[in-house]
Structure formats: C-alpha cells, structure tokens
Amino acid sequence: MDLPPEVDELFDDANGDLALGELDQAVAKYRRCVELMPEFFDGWHALGMAQMKSGHFPEAIEAGKRAVELQPNDQLAWSSLSLFYVRDGQIKEAEAAGVKAKILSWGGKVKKEE
C-alpha cells in the first residue's frame, strides 16, 4: 500500500517517538495516521502497541480489533490483540485471539467476521 506523503511522514515520526519512549506523542501521531487513512493496517497495529505501552488497554484492544478486521490472516495482529486482552484482564478473549494466531502459525486461515 502506497502511503500519502503526509501519512508516511507522520508514521515515521510516530515510530521515532515510540523508540524514544515518547508514548503520548506516538499515540497522537498514529491516531492521526488512521484518521487520514482508515484502512492503514500498520497504523492500527502500531496504535494498539503504543496504547498498550501507555497502559490504555481498552483503546489498544479497539485498535487491535481494527487491525485484525483489516487483515484477518495476520498472525502478529492476532498475537498482539491477545496480549492487549491479557493486559486488560480479559482472559477468555485473549485465549480466543491466541487460538486464531496459533491456527495461522499452522498455515490455516481465519474467516473474516461479519
């Protein structure tokens, strides 16, 4: 997916902020990326990770759900969503997401939920 220059620059800046531990700035920039480009899988996944690192678990879960909606056969997205659920204490949901990641690791596919 070709990113518009503004989104590409924002995403790079957000990655730099995340690397420096500037989580609030990273979250704001990732959020802006997905506002500008709602189908940007990497933006949603990165937003979820930054939200988790910030301790905002419900927000991380929402971003993670959006990522797996966009790419339901991405093993890392399901693994991340499972982690977000664990951090939020939602063990049943974490296990369900973890199973989907495991299925993908075995070469299976996950049906896109309607």
Annotate the PLM regions.
Residues 8, 13, 19-29, 54-66, ...:
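Structural signature of tandem alpha-helical TPR/SEL1-like repeats
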